[in-house]
Structures are given as structure tokens and as C-alpha cells.
């Protein structure tokens, strides 16, 4: 079985409704260093990351320590929104209170793509893999693994490490990452 280390990006320098692609702030950079210190003894491992700046900056610490380059995969990116920048925060707060059954078909397809991509890693490689991604993508994977239909089935903190196993096209939760109060900024 392939272990997947799902890392939520570090704290962003701006909120969801203020910047389409913020980097990390000082706290986020410190979180990324701490996460890298926790994972460093396990590697080097293959890495996959979302194309967004906050995930790239989070992954960069491990890339540097391990001397590897993460593969960018938009499938593990942020939950898609057609809302304007000003309306995104309100939209996300509303959506996160629901279930995947209540979500739009586009969001359901996004969730299915995230889950399928993560489940496929175990079919493609026997190597444990680090995936630097986002709050909702991690929840989509954990929800699929546990049969929980809520968009938010737990609250992974910034730079938390959630461990799943991928085998036979299925995901299984090994360990949930550290949880924190997450506020949509």
C-alpha cells in the first residue's frame, strides 16, 4: 500500500476573497519549515503539489531539503469557484456547510477528480508520496475514504499532515492531521 502524506499549505498572506493566488505569510513560512522537519526523515519522496502559490511555497521547503522537484497537478488545486473575488469568501462559507450531494454537479465532478487522482497514485507507484494541497481537497479525500458526505468532515490545520493509504483504487485513512479552527478570510 502506498502512503499519501496530504499536507495542507501554510497560512496564506491574504484571504480567499482578497487575492486569487496569495503566497505564504511569515506564520505560513514557519509552518512550512516545521512540516518539512517532520517529514524530512521519511524522504526523499515523490511530491505532487497544487499550482497555487501558497502550495508551491509550502512544498519548496521539502523540495530544497530533499533535492527533488514536486510535480504540479491542477487536480489537487483549490475548490473551483465562478464567483467574483469579492463574493468568493461568502460563497465558500456557505458551500462548506453543505454536503457533496447538495453541491453543484461541477463541484461533485471536482471532488471525484481529486479522489480519483489520489486513489490512482497507489496504482501508479509503490512509493509513498507527499501531496501539498488545500483544505477542501483533503476533506474530499477523507470524506471519500470514510463515507462522510459532508464537504467538511474535519478541519486540517495549516501544514498539517494527513496520512492516507492508496491501494486497489481506494483510499483509507491512517491518521488525520492536526486540526485547527479554520476561518475563511
Regions found by a protein language model. Give the residues of each.
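Generic beta-sheet signal
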Residues: 4, 125-136
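Histidine-centered active-site/metal-ligand motif
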Residues: 9, 134, 180-181
Amino acid at each position: 500500500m502506498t502512503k499519501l502524506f496530504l499536507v495542507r499549505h501554510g497560512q496564506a498572506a491574504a484571504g480567499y476573497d482578497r487575492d486569487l493566488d496569495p503566497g505564504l505569510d511569515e506564520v505560513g513560512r514557519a509552518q512550512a519549515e516545521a512540516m518539512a522537519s517532520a517529514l524530512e526523515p521519511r524522504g526523499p519522496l515523490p511530491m505532487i503539489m497544487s499550482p497555487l502559490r501558497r502550495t508551491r511555497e509550502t512544498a519548496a521547503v521539502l523540495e530544497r531539503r530533499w533535492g527533488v522537484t514536486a510535480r504540479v497537478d491542477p487536480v489537487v488545486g483549490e475548490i473551483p469557484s465562478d464567483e467574483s473575488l469579492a463574493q468568493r469568501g461568502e460563497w465558500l462559507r456557505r458551500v462548506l456547510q453543505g454536503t457533496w450531494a447538495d453541491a453543484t454537479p461541477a463541484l461533485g465532478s471536482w471532488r471525484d477528480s481529486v479522489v480519483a487522482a489520489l486513489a490512482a497514485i497507489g496504482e501508479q507507484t509503490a512509493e509513498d508520496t507527499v501531496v501539498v494541497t488545500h483544505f477542501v481537497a483533503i476533506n474530499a479525500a477523507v470524506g471519500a475514504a470514510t463515507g462522510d458526505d459532508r464537504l467538511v468532515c474535519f478541519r486540517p490545520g495549516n501544514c498539517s499532515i494527513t496520512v492516507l493509504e492508496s491501494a486497489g483504487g481506494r483510499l483509507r485513512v491512517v491518521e488525520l492531521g492536526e486540526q485547527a479552527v479554520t476561518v475563511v478570510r
